[in-house]
């Protein structure tokens, strides 16, 4: 490709509305342009990277035995009504009617469509297992699209769906997809972790997220410093303290705390260790309960894990925090004065709270706290559960090492769906025993456009993008200095351009009438891994300057050796 016949579209300045580095660099490198909120046009350089990512995904999915299909973006509403997700999905599901007033949705995912296809196409267990995938546009009407293509409304996704007649068969495919995803992200040169995850709105049982580690990530990724244990913050288990509860050394005392409505204020005003405080959060109880609310207690320096809390049998789903009015109707005190003593509703305490002694908590009287509370002396120990987020330094749940926490960008997610959708849509086949058998499903997604942004978040410097070789838009940049004035430079540039292309190498020849500084800046911004610079001064010695983008090292290579050298660097 020649720059004179290419839309380079680089920008010198960073657009003001671009928050994260990937968004900034994708705009500056001429990869994308914003059309509307959460909607982007992909320019040639961006498309080249996108296709590289797609091709790696496609190759590994095919290698793992998956079969490619293509399903419509527009889906009839009756399928979503049949699955029950028409009511469940919420405003992210874009709904519309056609000219015949028939309701449709713009697909955010394709479980319903593929299950409908399978229930009409398969009839016998002998046809299974099967795993279908597509690389297709999705649309989710995000309330606040941000970070460029990281959280856009329209995006490209690889989604796969497998069908089975047994859990054992599903597990085999799930393991194959886990391995395929690991190969995909390794081939792309990404630093990632596969972590245990919550199944969320998709549903099902087992689930793993593939997280690219990056400071700008929206997720907290938890992993052991010595073992393979990894989970997202929502699922990571906070194990109970090993040390037994210390004996009481204080009497419980009622203290006036009129200006201490938060843990921070309580700690500051009374010079308390925060680890000796407990905060109490009230949430709505499950429908049909004899109590309207449930009290959840965590240590003052810990955070409630809402996913864990929502899974408690006595707690309503989705998790809903009580309003001050609802709290006062039950407890007769406001949110800043709540605690376990004389709490008139069910109480669930975190494992760490259960190990505390001589602690401080609200007295369920406005402006008052109890100091020196001890379990079983001042109040009976209530139900104990793991309901907090882990923190760095906690022991790993597998008993090996301690936990580290880093930010991550979710680029892939695999689920064991079970029979959630096949039961709802009555997808079954004749089993080996001749009886009708509901199919068991797996679901496997990769955010293709998000992978591009995540790769940049891990691979950049002050000059621009530093692409991993496997997904760079071009492999080699040829920068001929003053080629329009030097016949020797021009002739060699054309010769090398042809020879490298003949070797199957993707080359960008910068044949613009531009200053060298502009040419260098653009190539470094775009992030092409290998650059060769042709200039009369070096050619006098039969030399070409070679530069590797990742480490910035330069070296002189003889003209006759440069093609062989580049082929070896790129192809090994």
UniProtKB/Swiss-Prot annotation:
Which GO terms of type biological process are on file? prolyl-tRNA aminoacylation
- Domain of life from the UniProt record: Bacteria
Annotated S-S bridges: none
- Cellular-component GO terms for this entry: cytosol
| Reactions listed under catalytic activity | tRNA(Pro) + L-proline + ATP = L-prolyl-tRNA(Pro) + AMP + diphosphate
The EC number on file is 6.1.1.15
Keywords of the record, alphabetical order, are: Aminoacyl-tRNA synthetase, ATP-binding, Cytoplasm, Ligase, Nucleotide-binding, Protein biosynthesis
Pfam families, per the entry: HGTP_anticodon (PF03129), tRNA-synt_2b (PF00587), tRNA_edit (PF04073)
Q: Can you say where in the cell this protein is located?
A: Cytoplasm
Q: Which GO terms describe its molecular function?
A: aminoacyl-tRNA deacylase activity; ATP binding; proline-tRNA ligase activity
Cross-referenced CDD domains: ProRS-INS, ProRS_anticodon_short, ProRS_core_prok
Which SUPFAM superfamilies does the record cross-reference, listed alphabetically? Class II aaRS ABD-related, Class II aaRS and biotin synthetases, YbaK/ProRS associated domain
Q: What does this protein do?
A: Catalyzes the attachment of proline to tRNA(Pro) in a two-step reaction: proline is first activated by ATP to form Pro-AMP and then transferred to the acceptor end of tRNA(Pro). As ProRS can inadvertently accommodate and process non-cognate amino acids such as alanine and cysteine, to avoid such errors it has two additional distinct editing activities against alanine. One activity is designated as 'pretransfer' editing and involves the tRNA(Pro)-independent hydrolysis of activated Ala-AMP.
Entry note about domains: Consists of three domains: the N-terminal catalytic domain, the editing domain and the C-terminal anticodon-binding domain.
Q: Which family does it belong to?
A: Belongs to the class-II aminoacyl-tRNA synthetase family. ProS type 1 subfamily.
Q: What is annotated about its quaternary structure and interactions?
A: Homodimer.
The record's annotation in PANTHER family points to: MITOCHONDRIAL RIBOSOME PROTEIN L39/PROLYL-TRNA LIGASE FAMILY MEMBER (PTHR42753), PROLINE--TRNA LIGASE (PTHR42753:SF2)
Q: What is this protein called?
A: Proline--tRNA ligase
User: Which organism is this entry from?
Assistant: Escherichia coli O157:H7
Q: Which gene encodes it?
A: proS
């Amino acid at each position: 490709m020649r720059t004179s016949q290419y839309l380079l579209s680089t920008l010198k300045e960073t657009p003001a509305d671009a928050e994260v580095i990937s968004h900034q660099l994708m705009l500056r490198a001429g990869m994308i342009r914003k059309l509307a909120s959460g909607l982007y046009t992909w320019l040639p350089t961006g498309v080249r990277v996108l296709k590289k990512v797609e091709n790696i995904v496609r190759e590994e999915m095919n290698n793992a035995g998956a079969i490619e299909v293509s399903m419509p973006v527009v889906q009839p509403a009756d399928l979503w009504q049949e699955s029950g997700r028409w009511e469940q999905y919420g405003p992210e599901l874009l709904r519309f009617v056609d000219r015949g007033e028939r309701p449709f949705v713009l697909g955010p995912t394709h479980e319903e469509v593929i299950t409908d296809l399978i229930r009409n196409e398969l009839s016998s267990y002998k046809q299974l297992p099967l795993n279908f995938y597509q690389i297709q546009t999705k649309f989710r009407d995000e309330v606040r699209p941000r970070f460029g293509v990281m959280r856009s409304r329209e995006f490209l996704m690889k989604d796969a769906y497998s069908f089975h007649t047994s859990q054992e068969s599903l597990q085999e495919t799930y393991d194959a997809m886990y391995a395929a995803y690991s190969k995909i992200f390794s081939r792309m040169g990404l630093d990632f972790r596969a972590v245990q995850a919550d199944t969320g709105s998709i549903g099902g049982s087992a689930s793993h997220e593939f997280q690219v580690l990056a400071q700008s990530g929206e997720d907290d990724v938890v992993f052991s410093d010595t073992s393979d244990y990894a989970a997202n913050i929502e699922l990571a288990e906070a194990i109970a303290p090993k040390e037994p509860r210390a004996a009481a050394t204080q009497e419980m005392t009622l203290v006036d705390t009129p200006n201490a409505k938060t843990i921070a204020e309580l700690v500051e005003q009374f010079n308390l260790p925060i680890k000796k405080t407990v905060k109490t959060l009230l949430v709505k109880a499950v429908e049909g309960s004899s109590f309207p609310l449930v009290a959840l207690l965590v240590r003052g320096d810990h955070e409630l894990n809402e996913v864990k809390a929502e899974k408690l049998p006595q707690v309503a789903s989705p998790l809903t925090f009580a309003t001050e009015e609802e709290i006062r109707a039950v407890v007769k005190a406001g949110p800043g004065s709540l605690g376990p003593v004389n709490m008139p509703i069910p109480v669930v305490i975190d494992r760490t709270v259960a190990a505390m002694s001589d602690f401080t908590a609200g007295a369920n009287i406005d402006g008052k706290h109890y100091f020196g509370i001890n379990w079983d002396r001042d109040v009976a120990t209530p139900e104990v559960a793991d309901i907090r987020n882990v923190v760095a330094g906690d022991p790993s749940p597998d008993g090996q090492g301690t936990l580290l926490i880093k930010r991550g960008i979710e680029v892939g997610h695999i689920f064991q769906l079970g029979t959630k959708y096949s039961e709802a849509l009555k997808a079954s086949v004749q089993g080996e025993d001749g009886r009708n058998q509901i199919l068991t499903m797996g679901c496997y997604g990769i955010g293709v456009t998000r992978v591009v942004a995540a790769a940049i978040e891990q691979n950049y410097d002050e000059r621009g993008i530093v692409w991993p070789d496997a997904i760079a838009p071009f492999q080699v940049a040829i920068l001929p200095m003053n080629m329009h004035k030097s016949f020797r430079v021009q002739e060699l540039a054309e010769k090398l351009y042809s020879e490298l292309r003949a070797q199957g190498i993707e080359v960008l020849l910068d044949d613009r009438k531009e200053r060298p500084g502009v040419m260098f800046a653009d190539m470094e911004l775009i992030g092409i891994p290998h650059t060769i610079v042709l200039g009369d001064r070096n050619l006098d010695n039969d030399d070409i300057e070679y530069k590797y983008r990742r480490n910035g090292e330069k070296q002189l290579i003889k003209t006759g050796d440069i093609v062989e050298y580049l082929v070896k660097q790129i192809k090994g």
